[in-house]
Regions:
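Non-catalytic substrate-recognition and accessory regions of acyl/acetyltransferase enzymes
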Residues: 1-6, 103
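N-terminal strand-loop-strand
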Residues: 7-53, 66
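Active-site segment of metal-dependent pyrophosphate-handling enzymes
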Residues: 20-24, 66-70, 78-115, 123, ...
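Short, His- and charge-rich active-site/binding loops that engage polyanionic ligands
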Residues: 38, 42-45, 49, 56, ...
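Hydrophobic alpha-helical positions that pack around
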Residues: 55, 69, 73
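NUDIX/MutT-family hydrolases
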Residues: 116-154, 163-176
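Short helix-coil junctions and helix-kink-helix linkers
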Residues: 175-183
């Protein structure tokens, strides 16, 4: 251990000023052939126990934001291997009633599969975008921003292909793009 590291060892996680917690939230889109859907988890703990939210949670001290997002997604839904993209950071001071929390939001497009609530999520379920219930925290705002980002992104990148089977028809592709652009 270097002399500098030895000198700083006692300072680990000691701060003069209060600091916020950091979380991640994952907006996961799927397509059932007709409608665009979003994956939600039912919160099993306060605050907002029983309300629907995006998979997510607090970062561990030894992980990156992306690692934390993927860990929470797996723990709360069983979903693994999603290619997630960061799209926005939400930092309103009162967004979480427990404490000052900043969340880094990710979105992903995945082939719909069976999911199951785990960890602090009592359930996990796919919802059509026009059937999303009122969400916990500021997740309604996060969903609107994710939809807007996806609609913009689809004009520049072939992002929709992750939602289609390996072999698909032009009609399936058209249905997908219409579903995304009409959200």
């Amino acid at each position: 251990m270097s002399e500098e590291n030895k000198a700083n060892e006692g300072l680990k996680y000691s701060y003069k000023y209060p600091h916020p917690s950091v979380t991640t939230d994952c907006v996961i889109f799927g397509f059932d052939g007709v409608k665009l859907k979003v994956l939600l988890v039912e919160r099993g703990m306060a605050p907002y126990k029983g309300r629907w939210a995006f998979p997510g949670g607090f970062l561990n001290m030894d992980e990156s934001a992306e690692e934390g997002a993927l860990r929470e997604l797996k723990e709360e839904t069983g979903l693994e291997g999603a290619y997630i993209r960061q799209f926005h950071t939400f930092s309103a001071p009162q967004r979480d009633p427990r404490e000052r929390v900043i969340t880094i939001a990710y979105y992903a497009l995945v082939t719909m599969q069976e999911v199951k609530g785990g960890d602090d999520a009592s359930d996990a379920r796919w919802f059509a975008l026009d059937e999303v219930p009122p969400l916990a925290f500021d997740h309604d705002q996060i969903l609107r921003k994710a939809e807007k980002t996806l609609r913009q992104q689809i004009h520049f990148e072939p992002v929709g292909f992750e939602l289609l089977p390996e072999k698909f028809t032009i009609k399936q592709l058209q249905n997908l793009y219409e579903a995304i652009l009409d959200m």
